[in-house]
Amino acid sequence: MNVKIESSWQQRLQEEFDKPYFEKLVNFVKNEYGKAHILPPGHQIFHVFNSCPFQNVKVVILGQDPYPNPGQYYGICFSVPDGVAIPGSLSNIFKEIHQDLGKPIPNSGNLDRWVKQGVFPMNSVLTVRAHETGSHRNIGWETFTDAVIKKLSEERENLVFMLWGSYAKEKASLIDTDKHLILTAVHPSPRSADYGFFGCKHFSKANTFLRSRGIEEIDW
């Protein structure tokens, strides 16, 4: 199957695109776009891939579902466009960066500047029905994004994987810990951040690891 995606990802994921499950997934999602309000707009489904080529990835942040409210999600996990109110989880991420590194808390929740530096914030599920959280779980996206994690683990070295919350932590089994750093904590959601996300210091730990490998750190 021909999928419009950045060339370095195309090369490594074509095997997935050609599998029967992916064809079923695409057909399901296309049908959904035809009958319901689906997020993000179709051209933004692979936005994080198109913005961060395979060889540029330094830090992987794994989420679960896209934001279900129209105008928020545009294909980058946790991120929202300029001018959109910063969601609670992202606000807590910014607070932890402030506590960890002393960075001022941004006025915008747009994380494009992270992505340009090699941060790869990817949801496990890449589409959702508006106002219906989790409505596109178990249709095939998880199989695809698991393959993305495996491909990064196998073909790259010295990556940092940030796994927040029990769902993301389950993905640790896909990652080669001899080659990569895995950082785990509770989810930054307002419901859980006080129980181990605040104080996790993942952002300084990531930069320390990158520097130790001779890799330029992230300006969080």
Swiss-Prot record:
The record's active-site residues are: D65 (proton acceptor)
Record carries keyword DNA damage: yes
Record carries keyword Metal-binding = no
Q: Which GO terms of the molecular function aspect are on file?
A: uracil DNA N-glycosylase activity
> What are the record keywords, sorted?
Cytoplasm, DNA damage, DNA repair, Hydrolase
Where's it found, cell-wise? Cytoplasm
GO biological process, alphabetically ordered: base-excision repair, AP site formation via deaminated base removal
- InterPro entries reported for this sequence: UDG_fam1, Ura-DNA_Glyclase_AS, Uracil-DNA_glycosylase-like, Uracil-DNA_glycosylase-like_sf
EC number in record = 3.2.2.27
Query: What is the first-listed, main subcellular location in coarse terms?
Result: cytoplasm
Name the enzyme group at the top EC level. Answer: hydrolase
For this record, the Gene Ontology CC terms, alphabetical, are:
cytoplasm
Q: Which reaction does it catalyse?
A: Hydrolyzes single-stranded DNA or mismatched double-stranded DNA and polynucleotides, releasing free uracil
What this protein is reported to do is described as: Excises uracil residues from the DNA which can arise as a result of misincorporation of dUMP residues by DNA polymerase or due to deamination of cytosine.
To which protein family does this belong?
Belongs to the uracil-DNA glycosylase (UDG) superfamily. UNG family.
HAMAP family listed in its UniProt record: UDG
What the entry lists under NCBIfam families is as follows:
PRK05254.1-1 (NF003588), PRK05254.1-2 (NF003589), PRK05254.1-4 (NF003591), PRK05254.1-5 (NF003592), ung (TIGR00628)
UniProt name for this protein: Uracil-DNA glycosylase 1
